[in-house]
C-alpha cells in the first residue's frame, strides 16, 4: 500500500481485516528522509517527506484503530531527530517531531480502550536509509563516508550504530503484556546520542 494515498491505505487495511478479522498491533514504520535545507529545499521533496512520514502515519492509524481490540498497540517509528534539530534536515526533523506529538495525543484518545500508543526514536541505525544519509552528508561536507561515520560515531557515547534487530526487540517489548502500562512515550534507542 502507498501510505501517502488514503484510498490505498483504506483498501490495504480492509484486506488485512478481511483476512485476519482484526488488527492487534499497528507499527507505523514507513518513512523517507532527505537533505532539505530551507534556503535550498525543493518544496515538493520537503512536502513528500512530511506527507509520507506524518500524513501516511495518520492515514494508517486512522484506518486501523477501529479494528484494534481493547488492549491493542500502536507504535510510531520516529527518530531522535524528532527530539533535536539537525541542519539541512528540516523536513525530516519536522515530520519526526510531529510523530511524537501525534503519539502523545493519540495515547490519550485511545486510553479508554486500554490501547497503548508509543513512539520509538532510533538514532543512527544500520539501515539503507541511514547509509544513504551518511553518503549525502559526507558528499556535502567534501569528506569520505568512512570519515563522516567515524566523526558521527565519535559523538555517540556508545560509539556505534543501532542494529535494526534492537529496534525490533523494543517494538516486541512494547507489544508484550509487560508493555501494557507504557503509553504516550517517545523512547530513544540511540546508543546515548540523546538523553531526552
Predicted feature locations:
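Substrate-binding pocket helix/loop in short-chain dehydrogenase/reductase
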Residues: 37-38, 42-50, 152
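Active-site helix of classical SDR
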Residues: 61, 95, 103
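Active-site loop-to-helix junction immediately N-terminal to the catalytic Tyr of the SDR YXXXK motif
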Residues: 41, 85-93, 105, 133
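Residue(s) in the substrate-gating loop at a strand-loop-helix junction
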Residues: 79
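Short, small/polar-rich loop/turn modules that mediate ligand/substrate recognition or access, typified
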Residues: 111, 116, 182-184
Amino acid at each position: 500500500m502507498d501510505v501517502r494515498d488514503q484510498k490505498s491505505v483504506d483498501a490495504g487495511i480492509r484486506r488485512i481485516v478481511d483476512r485476519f478479522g482484526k488488527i492487534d498491533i499497528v507499527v507505523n514504520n514507513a518513512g523517507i528522509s532527505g537533505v532539505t535545507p530551507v534556503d535550498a529545499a525543493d518544496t515538493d521533496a520537503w512536502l513528500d517527506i512530511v506527507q509520507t512520514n506524518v500524513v501516511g502515519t495518520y492515514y494508517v492509524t486512522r484506518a486501523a484503530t477501529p479494528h484494534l481490540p481493547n488492549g491493542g498497540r500502536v507504535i510510531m517509528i520516529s527518530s531522535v531527530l524528532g527530539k533535536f534539530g539537525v541542519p539541512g534536515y528540516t523536513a525530516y526533523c519536522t515530520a519526526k517531531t510531529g510523530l511524537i506529538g501525534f503519539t502523545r495525543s493519540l495515547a490519550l484518545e485511545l486510553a479508554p480502550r486500554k490501547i497503548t500508543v508509543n513512539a520509538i526514536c532510533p538514532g543512527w541505525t544500520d539501515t539503507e536509509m541511514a547509509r544513504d544519509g551518511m553518503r549525502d552528508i559526507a558528499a556535502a561536507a567534501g569528506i569520505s563516508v568512512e570519515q563522516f561515520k567515524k566523526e558521527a560515531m565519535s559523538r555517540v557515547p556508545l560509539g556505534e550504530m543501532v542494529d535494526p534487530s534492537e529496534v525490533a526487540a523494543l517494538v516486541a517489548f512494547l507489544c508484550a503484556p509487560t508493555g501494557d502500562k507504557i503509553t504516550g512515550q517517545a523512547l530513544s534507542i540511540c546508543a546515548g546520542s540523546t538523553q531526552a
